[in-house]
């Protein structure tokens, strides 16, 4: 059997004898070389790749031959002489592994120890825990329980019948019957009554002092209000007098300004009129003087009237014109 024509298919098996190691077809039941029968120890062979064949070799146009094989894991095409894939190192012929479902960890399920446990009918389990069926029930017989209860009751009675002479139980009664003459029990009542009286007196004194202080505080407040009202009235009267004096001074200033305005209105006309000595002018002056010596109210009314002011100005102008004509 030449190596060129040797092809491994699925199901072929290897002889379990290490010296032989012959690869047999899947249909053989015994080794073809040593004659040893096929057993469960015989490992199955698996092809890691398949030959591409003549058709694919022709399509490659001389790049690959018909004996070249294609890897099943990475689909790489390898030469026929390679026993492993050039890309993923998958063997061309590999041993078929048994599918046991194990994870493949260290010593997994190889030497598993199964401890056989027998369920006992005892009260406690192997870990020392009380079983559920015995938790709410009394395990011992009723006679044992009664004996235990009797012993406990006897022990309590013995404790009660012990001598109590060593304990001084009557000391409290002796203390209650002791003489109380050394204690002044009535003094506390008298002190309480005295304290109450002193408190009442202090309260009455504080109230009277409070009323006096309030009356005193009210009297200066009333005097203050009176002084304030007086100061306000005096200030109002002063302000009124000041306003009247200001009005009078203003009226006097306005009168003097009107007089000065009249005197300075026509200086040339006055010069002309002074040169002319007319009897009419003298009469007017005498009339104005007599009016000035009279009542001030009449003088104010005459000075304020615009018609008379206009007449006097026209008269002065006529006198000036007459004097100028005489000079000519």
Swiss-Prot record:
Q: Name one GO biological process term.
A: mRNA processing
Q: Where in the cell is it found?
A: Nucleus
Presence of keyword RNA-binding: yes
Which residue ranges have biased composition labelled Low complexity?
211-224, 232-242, 313-328
Zinc finger (RanBP2-type) in chain: 9-40, 65-94
Enumerate composition-biased segments (Basic residues). Answer: 196-210, 251-271, 297-312
The task this protein performs is described as: Splice factor required for alternative splicing of TRA2B/SFRS10 transcripts. Binds to ssRNA containing the consensus sequence 5'-AGGUAA-3'. May interfere with constitutive 5'-splice site selection.
Q: Which PANTHER family match?
A: ZINC FINGER RAN-BINDING DOMAIN-CONTAINING PROTEIN 2, ZINC FINGER RAN-BINDING DOMAIN-CONTAINING PROTEIN 2 ZRANB2-RELATED
What's the name of the protein? Zinc finger Ran-binding domain-containing protein 2
Which source organism does the UniProt entry give?
Answer: Sus scrofa (Pig)
């Amino acid at each position: 059997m030449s190596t060129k024509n040797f092809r491994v298919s699925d199901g072929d098996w290897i002889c379990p004898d290490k010296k032989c190691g012959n690869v047999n077809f899947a249909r053989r039941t015994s080794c073809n070389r040593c004659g040893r029968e096929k057993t469960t120890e015989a490992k199955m062979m698996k092809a890691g790749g398949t030959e591409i064949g003549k058709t694919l070799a022709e399509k490659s146009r001389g790049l690959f031959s018909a004996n070249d094989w294609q890897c099943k894991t990475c689909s790489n095409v390898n030469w026929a002489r390679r026993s492993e894939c050039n890309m993923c190192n998958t063997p061309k012929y590999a041993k078929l592994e048994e599918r046991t479902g194990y994870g493949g960890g260290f010593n997994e399920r190889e030497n598993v120890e199964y401890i056989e446990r027998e369920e006992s009918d005892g009260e406690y389990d192997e870990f020392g825990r009380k079983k559920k069926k015995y938790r709410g029930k009394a395990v011992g017989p009723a006679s044992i329980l009664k004996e235990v209860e009797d012993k406990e009751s006897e022990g309590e009675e013995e404790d009660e019948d012990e001598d109590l002479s060593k304990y001084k139980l009557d000391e409290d009664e002796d203390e209650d019957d002791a003489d109380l003459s050394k204690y002044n029990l009535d003094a506390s009542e008298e002190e309480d009554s005295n304290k109450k009286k002193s408190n009442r007196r202090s309260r009455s004194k504080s109230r009277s002092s409070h009323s006096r202080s309030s009356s005193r505080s009210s009297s200066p407040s009333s005097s203050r209000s009176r002084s304030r009202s007086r100061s306000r009235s005096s200030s109002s009267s002063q302000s009124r007098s000041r306003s009247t004096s200001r009005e009078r001074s203003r009226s006097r200033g306005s009168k003097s300004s009107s007089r000065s305005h009249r005197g300075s209105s026509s200086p040339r006309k006055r010069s002309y009129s002074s040169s002319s000595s007319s009897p009419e002018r003298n009469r007017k002056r005498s009339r104005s003087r007599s009016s000035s010596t009279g009542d001030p109210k009449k003088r104010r009314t005459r000075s304020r009237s615009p018609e008379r002011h206009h007449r006097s100005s026209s008269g002065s102008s006529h006198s000036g014109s007459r004097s100028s004509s005489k000079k000519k």
